[in-house]
Amino acid sequence: MAEFDITRIPRYSSKSSYAHFDHRVSFAEAQTKILDSEYVSHHAFYPLISNEIIAVRYRGGKRSCKVRNIAYASHFDHRVFQYYSYLWSDLYNKKAIAEEFNEVAVAYRSSLSSCGAVTAVSNISSAKMAFDYIREQDSAFVLTGDFESFFDNLNHVHLMTSLRSLFPSGRLPDDHYQVIKNILRYSCWPIADLAARHELPWPAIDPTREKMISDAAIELRFKSIRELNKLDVILPKSEFLANKSKVITRPWKRTGIGLGIPQGLAASGVLANIYMADIDMKVRLAVERVGGLYLRYCDDFIIAVPKSGFDALVEAINLMADVDSVKLQPEKTKVFRVDGGGVAQLDFESGRAGKVYPYSGVHPAQKVSFLGFDFDGRVVRLRQSTVGRYHKPLREAASAIARSNQGEGRHASKKRVSALYQHYSPLGIKGRGLCPSAGSDSSAFFRYGNFLSYVARAQKAFPNDPIAPDESKIYRKIKRLSAR
C-alpha cells in the first residue's frame, strides 16, 4: 500500500452536521481505530439511514421532479468508508495506469498517495476535452449515454471479483473484506420511521408520479430533517436495539442474486470505477485504434470517433450495452453524426448493428449533451436544465424579499438582501464583492461562491462560447423581482 498523508482527508478535523445512531466524530478523533486493521476487521457497522433526494427541475417552463434514493452511514462508519475509499482508489489508479485506461474515468479519482499520479479533473474540463476533440474532426460519430439505476444494479459477484483483482494475491485482507461486505450486504433504517418516532411530519410521495410531488411536501420533509439533525443521536441506544430487527430493510436482497450498493457512501464512487474497469479498458482499446476518445463520469459517458472509425464506435456501443447487470438508459443513450452541417441524431439500434440510419422518432436531438453542457456543432452552451436550477431559487428568494418590503415602513434586513446578492448575483463569484479574495484563508475561501462562480469557470474553459449571461441583466432581474 502507498503511504498516505491522512491529514489531507477532507474535513479531517471537522464533524458532520447530520444526526445518526452514533455521536458525531471527526476523522482525527477516530483515526487510531480506523488505521487499526484488526479493529476494522471485527467492527460492527450500524444500519444506514435511507432517504429520497427530490430534485425539482424546470425545462421549457415545465416543472418535473427526479427522485433519487440515497443512504448515509453513521459518523464512525462514514470515516471508515472514507479511508478505505482512498485505499481502493490508489489500487485502482495503479491498475488504470498500468493497463493504460487512466484517462477514461474522470470522476471519483481522489488520491492521498504521495506518488501524485492522478490529476483531479472537473466536469467542466471533461466536457471541454470531449467537445474540443469533436471540433477537431471534419466529421465525427458520437455516442452519449448513461446507465439505468446504475448503483442499484451493480452485481455483487462482479464487483467482488473486480475488487480482488486489485490485490496481488487476488485475496482481500480481512479488514477490506469486512468493509466491502458491509457495503454489499447493507441494511437501511428508513428516515420516515425516524421522523415518526420524533413526531415529525413526513409526507408520503409516489416516485412514479413525479408531477404530483408538491413543493409543500418537499419543504415539510426538509424541515423535519432539519429538526432531526439538531439531535445528538437520532435514537437512544435502547430504542435502537429494541426496534432494529423490525424496521431495517435489506434492499440488496430484492432480486435474490445480490444486486446494488447504496448511493451516497464515501466509497460508492470508487467502487463504480472498479466495477467498470475491464469495460473501460476494452472500450478505450477499441476507440484508440482509430484515434477516438472515451470519457466516463461515473455512469455518464461519451465516445467519439472520426468518420472513418465508425466500426470502432459500433464495437464500443456493444461493449457498453453488455456491461454485467446494468442496462443503458434508452431515452438518454444516443448516437450522433457531427460535421459542418451541425448535429444529426442517428438510430441507435441501427448503429449497434453497424448501419448509419437517421433517427426516425419524434423530436430528434440536435445537440450533443455531456455533463451539463450542450454542443450544437458550432457553440457550447450550458444546458437549459442546468440554468433552470439557478433561476428558480433566485425567483423564490427575490420574491420573498419583495413580500417583506410590502407595507409602509417595512423593509427586508440588510443581512437578507446581502445574502440574496451573495447567492445569486455576480457579487457572489469567488474573489468579488461579497466573497473573500484569493488571499483569504483557503479553507474559508472554498466555501464561498455561487452558481455564477461555476459559470465563470466554464466561460474561462470555453472562452469563445456563449456560456456566461449578461451580468447587467442579472442585476436588473434581481432588482425587479425583489422590487428594490
Language model features by range: what are they?
Residues K181-R197, T333-G351:
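Short, conserved secondary-structure transition motifs
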Residues L48, E52-Q82, E99-T119, E199-D215, ...:
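Short, conserved non-catalytic motifs in the polymerase core
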Residues A120-V142:
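A short acidic-Thr-Gly-centered motif at the start of a beta-strand
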Residues M1-S64, E471-R484:
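Non-catalytic, polymerase-adjacent accessory regions of viral genome-replication enzymes
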Residues S74, H78, Q82-Y84, L91, ...:
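Right-hand nucleic-acid polymerase module
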Residues Q137-Y297, I302-A316, V362-A365:
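Conserved polymerase palm-domain catalytic core
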